[in-house]
Amino acid sequence: MQVLHVCSEMFPLLKTGGLADVIGALPAAQIADGIDVRVLLPGFPDIRRGIPDAHVVSRRDTFAGKISLLFGHYNGVGVYLIDAPHLYERPGSPYHDTNLYAYTDNVLRFALLGWVGCEMACGLDPFWRPDVVHAHDWHAGLAPAYLAARGRPAKSVFTVHNLAYQGMFYAKHIDDIELPWSFFNMHGLEFNGQISFLKAGLYYADHITAVSPTYAREITEPQFAYGMEGLLRQRHLEGRLSGVLNGVDEKIWSPESDLLLASRYTRDTLEEKAENKRQLQIAMGLKVNDKVPLFAVVSRLTSQKGLDLVLEALPGLLEQGGQLALLGAGDPVLQEGFLAAAAEHPGQVGVQIGYHEAFSHRIMGGADIILVPSRFEPCGLTQLYGLKYGTLPLVRRTGGLADTVSDSSLENLADGIASGFVFEDSNAWSLLRAIRRAFVLWSRPSLWRFVQRQAMAMDFSWQVAAKSYRELYYRLK
């Protein structure tokens, strides 16, 4: 079984979000599981630099200009790169310029990604041809459409990491990207009068996966589906929509071996975690005190992530004696709000605007509770890191958060399945109730330690996801 992942980023070569973490870990787990997996990526500069052994395997003249297909290896995984400097070698992010405007030719840049994914199944590399093309998010959404146009030379899987991003472009570009006009209708890639790369993936793929079972159910409902609920409900009824939970890359996220921590620890040596807390309190300008619970946020500062709720609930958290350490960037209003809180409550609130991968490890190793109060969350990795590090997640019951965290209710404590704190409604009062429950558990140190050990014993390894995908691929054959 040969499988090609088609996507736009891969950790640690290039990362703008959780998609990169998935592609940085899943292929290696699948190779260990016995699948011959390779990855196809655009030749962005950071990716090119990270794979210096890449060599040319094919050259083509395409609708987007002349390209070369390169092949190399990264961490034991075979990686194809689309070498097209006129499309991919630019300042700014992979998707927009330094002024945050989307590149005007994104329709070509990412149509090409899908096209090459399809051409791989048609023999673009004469020595390797995938049985399954596995496309990820809107950037790769046209791969299943091109496969359909070519008579489906391979099976296709499309994974939705976040349905909110739909890859919308003017209808006139259908000629530019060399797809038939017959595809431009509601039973195809048309959405609200435009081309939707996301809908192309959803409509033409043989199977759709979402990154958690709960998110797979949620996206069949109007409040989560962004207008795609009819199609997704149909795919669910056909048995062509399922959820496969993301995993944790234990080579990178493990408190036992994490070199970024001041003190490494296991579930049997949790007392060693205290030194990480002390170091984090010093680094964030907080009062050094191991008797108070240290809450943390590592997130984009957006309303989707529920960070406005944290700001609203913060006075209640501080009144009960808690501390907050925040690392993140995003909405300027939220940034200013948290910076103002830090200025008003020195020693109790510490804020770093920006994102630093290394410092996020130090926060995870030092905090007591990680806050993830998202309004929606397809999977979420932050809470998985929290579980792994014995930093109890406090989450809203949605998407992957609902699948991975069990509330520390009396019943769950008795059954030995409690692993954090869960609240239902997306408002500050509901969040504060969960914060209050965290303080109550904190006041019972032996019970707190019991829940930490439960959380750290949970298995969210990529091997579990790899097995689920292997079973799916073989069902499609």
Swiss-Prot record:
Its EC number is 2.4.1.21. Signal peptide: none annotated. ADP-alpha-D-glucose binds at K15. Pfam families: Glyco_transf_5, Glycos_transf_1. SUPFAM superfamilies: UDP-Glycosyltransferase/glycogen phosphorylase. One of its GO terms (cellular component) is cytosol. GO terms for biological process: glycogen biosynthetic process. Keywords: Glycogen biosynthesis, Glycosyltransferase, Transferase. GO terms for molecular function: alpha-1,4-glucan glucosyltransferase (ADP-glucose donor) activity; alpha-1,4-glucan glucosyltransferase (UDP-glucose donor) activity. Pathway: Glycan biosynthesis; glycogen biosynthesis. It catalyses: [(1->4)-alpha-D-glucosyl](n) + ADP-alpha-D-glucose = [(1->4)-alpha-D-glucosyl](n+1) + ADP + H(+). Belongs to the glycosyltransferase 1 family. Bacterial/plant glycogen synthase subfamily. HAMAP family: Glycogen_synth. Synthesizes alpha-1,4-glucan chains using ADP-glucose. This is Glycogen synthase. The gene is glgA.
